[in-house]
Amino acid sequence: MTTQTMTAVSGNDGDTGGDAAESPPGGPLLALDGITVTFPGVRALDAVSLSVRAGEVHGLMGENGAGKSTLLKVLSGVNQPQAGTLTLNGTEQRFASTRAALEAGIAIIYQELHLVPELTVAENLMLGQLPSRLGVVDERTLAARALDALERLGEHIDPGIPVKYLSIGQRQMIEIGKALMRDARVIAFDEPTSSLSARETTQLFRIIRALRAEGRAIIYVTHRMEEVYELCDRVTVFRDGRRIDTFDSVTDLDRDRLIGCMVGRSIEDVYGYRPRAAGDVLIEAKGLAGPGLSEPVSFTARRGEIVGFFGLVGAGRSELMKLLYGAARPSAGHVELNGKRVAFGSPRDAVRAGLALCPEDRKQEGIVAIASVADNLNISARRHFSPARVLLDGRRERELAQRYIERLAIKTRDGDTPIGALSGGNQQKVVLARWLAERIDVFLMDEPTRGIDVGARAEIYNLFYELAEAGRTVILVSSDLAEVIGVSDRIIVMKEGRIAGEVAKAHATPDALIKLALPR
């Protein structure tokens, strides 16, 4: 591709590239009309129509199974529709392969990145179009083109190192670079921030805005509403394989209306708050100090309560959860369970005492992705079945797994399915089931619905209410204001490693929580 094409990517949002893609006169750059895709017994897309303009970021939202992924596969040539048309820049297209879609100018940045770990950055950037002389790769030209692309993306990466040594955020930039090297006019992002840090997310948004300024059409698939409001110009909602609505402006779009479109019910039904009477104090932290806390922390949580913890990034909430769980050692203070002082040398001690953590990073810390649903569910309970730890009781493990698959309505073929094949919401249910099998009293839930669609969230909230109604305690750490207000009985706000205040449900508003959470 030309240097001119990529100029705007590393510049200011207002720059425009010389080769910017343009919509045909009077029409969108990309148009889908009546697209239908069916699989045996399933209509994945039902007469879907959608248009995307040059120079816009068009958000796609919907629950898992709504049809978003199938739509991306149609765009990329993986799935061929049984009906409908796809028009690109005024010309009807039908892609028989991903190569055909790429050559036409459509690139997909999938959640699971399609890079070759053992190849270098430069080789991945130019995959399929390596420069050569007399049948031999021209290494000098390859390095020069790769370095030029990286500089324009604002990435200071050695083009000669293998991709396996890069962070997730850096790898994602390489995927974007691949699309630009092919001069893609339509670029679709599939849940791109699910594994990114806050800094990497900011960098990604800068790149996407620059791509929009060049006149490219951006499709942005996400579960995160705050990203839609921050980044997208328009948003289309899918449900059950159908396009429900397209909102031509997100500036004044009511959040409750957007959720209602996605799930087919009101926001009150999503959170479904169920008030209940609280019992005796079940867990109490007294002057707890340790890594990530700037001041000693004290709080109580009662049986039957859902206590929310809200705060900005770096407030110390996750660090506090690790101290409670025995994953970090306190430097002062202690924890009491049922009025008795406890000291956990490890998470195993905490679990045996009746306290468990569902960690923020579910994929890295909460599950074993290559193991089955049953194995993940039985990781902790296994000690009850095999006290000698010599022989595993496969029958009891299968029975337990099936019981909780049915009880929590975990959507999986069976217990032998790899947990990595499940949606985020169903993975989280497996983690919860693991602790339900252990007869846990205190559930520490650290960002439990991150990356999970709205429908699955409602199911998880109902589980929280059931736990509280059974006399257990749920401590909910969440950065989602609507969630922490909608689900919690009361909310503790942290900032800069300390507790900044507590807000009763009756007085919990976004303004009240943000005011407490903001640094001085």
Curated annotation (Swiss-Prot):
ATP binds at residues 62-69. GO terms for molecular function: ABC-type L-arabinose transporter activity; ATP binding; ATP hydrolysis activity. GO terms for biological process: L-arabinose transmembrane transport. It comes from the Bacteria. InterPro entries: AAA+_ATPase (IPR003593), ABC_carbohydrate_import_ATPase (IPR050107), ABC_transporter-like_ATP-bd (IPR003439), ABC_transporter-like_CS (IPR017871), P-loop_NTPase (IPR027417). It is an enzyme of class 7 (translocase). The keyword Hydrolase does not apply. Disulfide bonds: none annotated. It catalyses: L-arabinose(out) + ATP + H2O = L-arabinose(in) + ADP + phosphate + H(+). Residues 30-265, 265-516 form the ABC transporter domain. Its EC number is 7.5.2.12. Keywords: ATP-binding, Cell inner membrane, Cell membrane, Membrane, Nucleotide-binding, Repeat, Sugar transport, Translocase, Transport. Residues 1-10 have a biased composition (Polar residues). The keyword Transmembrane helix does not apply. PANTHER family: ARABINOSE IMPORT ATP-BINDING PROTEIN ARAG, CARBOHYDRATE TRANSPORT ATP-BINDING PROTEIN MG119-RELATED. The complex is composed of two ATP-binding proteins (AraG), two transmembrane proteins (AraH) and a solute-binding protein (AraF). Part of the ABC transporter complex AraFGH involved in L-arabinose import. Responsible for energy coupling to the transport system. Belongs to the ABC transporter superfamily. Arabinose importer (TC 3.A.1.2.2) family. This is Arabinose import ATP-binding protein AraG.
